[in-house]
């Protein structure tokens, strides 16, 4: 605390170093998120192969859509890392300018990167806080409120393109999925009454496993 109870402003160099540390910390968070999604995707691939062997093309299609969503999420996370690297480079430039001019300077590159980063759900809280600190320090201009509020992914896939689904399934099953029926029941013989209950129980367990996998992926992407 300074005189009259006012908080003393931190030196510009200290601010820049703090921002850089926070950015690097968030990059580690993003790296961890990417690894988690990719690990879950490997489980989905195994499930697709199992479902394809059983002739459950409808299950395969659902899982393929989850994989498409996950890959899009990973792609966006990699893009966010690129933006964070841009901010880190901007911080290095600020330190260089500080040594020469004695003060921080406005940066359009940092501004553009931060505008993208505040929209990423996984890191939005920290990026929003950093943006406000950078605005106060004069590095970036005040962001419009709708920049902060437009957090929802407008490009969320409602229905994956059939071509993309086919490509994913072909990739995982090495082209064998074309032999699978369009519905699970197409591949099933007429069951004996005693076996019907067992088949029903197995399908119910598989459905629960599918829902659990979808839930885990959705949680990782949120």
Curated annotation (Swiss-Prot):
Residues the record marks as site: Important for autoinhibitory function: 48
Region described as Intramolecular interaction with C-terminus: 2-113
Subcellular location as annotated: Cytoplasm, Cytosol; Membrane; Endosome; Late endosome membrane
Chain location of the short sequence motif MIT-interacting motif per the record: 201-211
Main location: cytoplasm
Biological process terms in GO annotation: autophagosome maturation; late endosome to lysosome transport; midbody abscission; mitotic metaphase chromosome alignment; multivesicular body sorting pathway; nuclear membrane reassembly; plasma membrane repair; protein transport
Lipid moiety-binding region (N-myristoyl glycine): 2
Span list, region Intramolecular interaction with N-terminus: 151-220
Stated role: Probable core component of the endosomal sorting required for transport complex III (ESCRT-III) which is involved in multivesicular bodies (MVBs) formation and sorting of endosomal cargo proteins into MVBs. MVBs contain intraluminal vesicles (ILVs) that are generated by invagination and scission from the limiting membrane of the endosome and mostly are delivered to lysosomes enabling degradation of membrane proteins, such as stimulated growth factor receptors, lysosomal enzymes and lipids. The MVB pathway appears to require the sequential function of ESCRT-O, -I,-II and -III complexes.
Assembly behavior: Probable core component of the endosomal sorting required for transport complex III (ESCRT-III). ESCRT-III components are thought to multimerize to form a flat lattice on the perimeter membrane of the endosome. Several assembly forms of ESCRT-III may exist that interact and act sequentially. Forms a metastable monomer in solution; its core structure (without part of the putative autoinhibitory C-terminal acidic region) oligomerizes into a flat lattice via two different dimerization interfaces.
Entry's family note: Belongs to the SNF7 family.
Protein name: Charged multivesicular body protein 3
Lineage, opening ranks: Eukaryota, Metazoa, Chordata, Craniata, Vertebrata
Recorded name of the encoding gene: CHMP3
